[in-house]
Curated annotation (Swiss-Prot):
Family membership: Belongs to the globin family.
Protein name, as recorded: Hemoglobin subunit alpha
GO biological process, one term: hydrogen peroxide catabolic process
Chain positions recorded as heme b binding sites: H89
GO CC terms: blood microparticle; haptoglobin-hemoglobin complex; hemoglobin complex
Gene this protein is translated from: HBA
CDD domains: Hb-alpha-like
Organism: Bathyraja eatonii
Subunit comment: Heterotetramer of two alpha chains and two beta chains.
Residues given in the record as O2 binding sites: H60
Domain Globin: 2-142
Amino acid sequence: MVLSDANKQEIHHVAELIKPHAEAVGADALARLFELHPQTKTYFPNFSGYHATDAPVKAHGAKVINAVLKAAEHLDDLPKHLEKLATKHGHELLVDPHNFVLFSDIIVVTLATKLPTFSPATHRAIDKFLEELVHQLSSKYR
């Protein structure tokens, strides 16, 4: 992954903006994923609902966004930082890796709706970051 210093600055700026709102951003993104790609609900059979206001959606959305925020702190060593998570997804959870692509696109849309300063440069930086994150999470699939 080639992230310029400007890209890294944009990523860190967005991370700081959304950190206090991780639960709301995550819940919104996850609810969008369920609405646009209902087949993804099969990975969450214990959820009683799939809306942003439902407690399980809030909790899992926060978990995902907090993991993304943590990854943003490790831009220079993403493969090492994400190795355990990639192994868990690739060998234990067995989530179709294409869902990472779907969810990363939805995260971008969610950020664009939440952040008035989401510029084309911000979009480019976040897109590059999430593309690498998806690549790393998919790296342990056989």
